[in-house]
Amino acid sequence: MSDIHVTPVFADAAPCASPAPEKINLLDLDRRQMREFFVQMGEKPFRADQIMKWIYHYCCDDFDAMTDINKVLRARLKQVAEIRAPEVAVEQRSSDGTIKWALQVGDQRVETVYIPEDDRATLCVSSQVGCALECKFCSTAQQGFNRNLRVSEIIGQVWRAAKIIGAQKVTGNRPITNVVMMGMGEPLLNLTNVIPAMEIMLDDFGFGLSKRRVTLSTSGVVPALDKLGDTIDVALAISLHAPNDTIRDEIVPINRKYNIDMFLGSVRRYLEKSNANQGRVTVEYVMLDHINDGTEHAHQLAECLKDTPCKINLIPWNPFPGAPFGRSSNSRIDRFSKVLMEYGFTVIVRKTRGDDIDAACGQLAGEVIDRTKRTLKKQAAGEPINVREV
């Protein structure tokens, strides 16, 4: 939202017959836009800083509770603005402490996952309703695509989770320390809204997270990745998942447009501009049984990544109904990992979290009204359908 138009409304304004204008959701505004909003109201820019602290430091959505704001301004704000985050439609709790929320965004739902650990708590955030990329091993991709999320619907996931976790301090839940843009959708296909949302995550008057604790994961939209590097500095993770173009063309179809060499070239350009990544990118590699998990694939991957400073995150595949894959055995993952380590790579095998509530990597689905008609096309072709699609 580049231009903000506010018609100041005073508490004693006379009623009129025309319908009231739609209120501005302050969660849609970054700090620059928030200051512009208050200037247009005839207020000093510092009011934006005050309001943002209430919204993000205290998870406050009630203007009347903002005690250092004078009553006249509070009354005016209630007439022209609101603080509205997505509401929780369904909450599920895993036996390992992971929490998944299905959040209502209009007439659909997206999923957000809170993952507590001993030394941190990570929130996995969605950027789109559904996903257009059709990665074959991902549940979200099978739902089709509807629309991009607004800034308020992205940062609102963090706000809603922080409010819930903050209200549960007596349970010992750890406050959110990290945010990963790894939920539903491809973040680089929604840069217009993802960048302002991440700026609020980083802003001292927002959530105040370190740029090393905000991570964007992408499947390889190369022009958008180049643009990201010119706009904001956050940690980067790449969804590679294959050691060569032949396999990646099949399981990550965007590779047919931006192949591995193009993708890794863009990654290296990003690293040259970034401080958040400390000189290396996280490579995500889902382990699919007898598809991409052989020792020959490990050698190919090492050769593929030899010029890209990275650490490699091996992800045991998390199943969903109708998927034509199997999870690699622990022994195959172990052999694969050892080959990479012999080349000098840092390798981490991701611990599966929340799989008992379909909250693990690749399992998020939500409720998507598919504008791509992907489910109908699959029915017509006689292909298996994820049971969560219908």
UniProtKB/Swiss-Prot annotation:
InterPro entries the record matches: Aldolase_TIM (IPR013785), Methyltransferase_A (IPR040072), RlmN_N (IPR048641), RNA_MTrfase_RlmN (IPR027492), rRNA_lsu_MTrfase_RlmN/Cfr (IPR004383), rSAM (IPR007197)
The record's keywords, sorted A to Z, are:
4Fe-4S, Cytoplasm, Disulfide bond, Iron, Iron-sulfur, Metal-binding, Methyltransferase, rRNA processing, S-adenosyl-L-methionine, Transferase, tRNA processing
Any one cellular component term from GO for this entry?
cytoplasm
Co-factor binding details = Binds 1 [4Fe-4S] cluster. The cluster is coordinated with 3 cysteines and an exchangeable S-adenosyl-L-methionine.
The transmembrane residues are: none
Q: What is its EC number?
A: 2.1.1.192
Q: Which cofactor does it need?
A: [4Fe-4S] cluster
Q: What's its catalytic activity?
A: adenosine(2503) in 23S rRNA + 2 reduced [2Fe-2S]-[ferredoxin] + 2 S-adenosyl-L-methionine = 2-methyladenosine(2503) in 23S rRNA + 5'-deoxyadenosine + L-methionine + 2 oxidized [2Fe-2S]-[ferredoxin] + S-adenosyl-L-homocysteine; adenosine(37) in tRNA + 2 reduced [2Fe-2S]-[ferredoxin] + 2 S-adenosyl-L-methionine = 2-methyladenosine(37) in tRNA + 5'-deoxyadenosine + L-methionine + 2 oxidized [2Fe-2S]-[ferredoxin] + S-adenosyl-L-homocysteine
Q: Where does S-adenosyl-L-methionine bind?
A: G185, E186, S217, S239, L240, H241, N318
Give the protein's function: Specifically methylates position 2 of adenine 2503 in 23S rRNA and position 2 of adenine 37 in tRNAs. m2A2503 modification seems to play a crucial role in the proofreading step occurring at the peptidyl transferase center and thus would serve to optimize ribosomal fidelity.
What this protein is called in its record is Dual-specificity RNA methyltransferase RlmN
What is the protein's species of origin?
Answer: Edwardsiella ictaluri (strain 93-146)
Specify the taxonomic lineage: Bacteria, Pseudomonadati, Pseudomonadota, Gammaproteobacteria, Enterobacterales
